[in-house]
Amino acid sequence: MGSILSKGSLFPEHLAQEIFNQVRGKSSIAKLCGQTPIPFNGIKEFTFSMDSEVDIVAENGAKSNGGATMGAVTIVPLKVEYGARVSDEFMTASEEEAISILQAWTEGFARKVAKGLDLMAIHGINPRTGSASTVIGTNNFDSKVTGSAIITYSASTPDTNIDDALAVIEAAGYEANGVVVAPTMRSAIAALTANGARKYPEFAWGAVPANLGSMVFDSNGTVSHGSSLDRALVGDFTAFKWGFSKELPLEVIPYGNPDNDATLGDLKGHNQVYLRSEAYLGWGILDKNAFALVKAAQSNG
């Protein structure tokens, strides 16, 4: 087992599927939008819209041009990785013990990828550094959703904020099917009262309902991560695509300094090996007009 892994290998089929399942369960983006397999070399999603309405043509009348607009969004997977040092006893562990370690690693890696998907797609940041990623560029909701599609957040009327976001989306010809809110906004909704009673009791005591009206609902700290002013992302998530390329390599590195850590130094010198996992995932916003953001006002302080 150890000698095979030391040369690098792929996750066994059931572990790879487990990663997919856990990402769907812990990423709000994944919850609101099912994944589409993305080829390793990327995929081009074509968008097509008819610019006008059908036209009545009188007998012997002339037909006019309704017009159509065609575009394309290219989705190219990018690579994310996670690595950590572990005791080299992993290399001599029994198969059962090694599988147990791999399953624990699988769960942890899945959680990191899930959170990373949200942070990258919503904010366009490198999850590890928290800084804007030049690799992602403007392929994120914070960059794409602007102008009248940004609703100013009010802690006293968070439900109205969502209604206002829905109005913007509907005016663009879409029907919102999903919403994810920051925990602060979920708490504000829970605190609303009418005639001395909770207005939305399904939010009481930290509850996160599966649906809000006809929309899939979730609450996640990734929305307001770091210093972000985002409080909610609302939209028609059929206008968003994301997915994995299939390979999920797990490499066990037995020597060297693969994490470039000058303090920890060589692996063999410290009886360690290095576990590194990589995933290839991509996403694309097919039409920014299908989405709206609720944002807190910028503080003057």
Task: Locate each region found by the language model.
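Protruding loop/beta-arch "assembly-hinge" segments enriched in small, turn-prone residues
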Residues: M1-S27, I253, D261-G301
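Assembly/oligomerization interface modules of large self-assembling protein complexes
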Residues: G2-G83, E107, A290
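A short, structural micro-pattern
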Residues: P39, L78, G173, N211, ...
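Alpha-helical scaffold segments that mediate packing/assembly in large oligomeric complexes
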Residues: S87-A171, L293-V294, S299-G301
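Extended oligomerization regions of viral-like shell subunits
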Residues: A149-D266
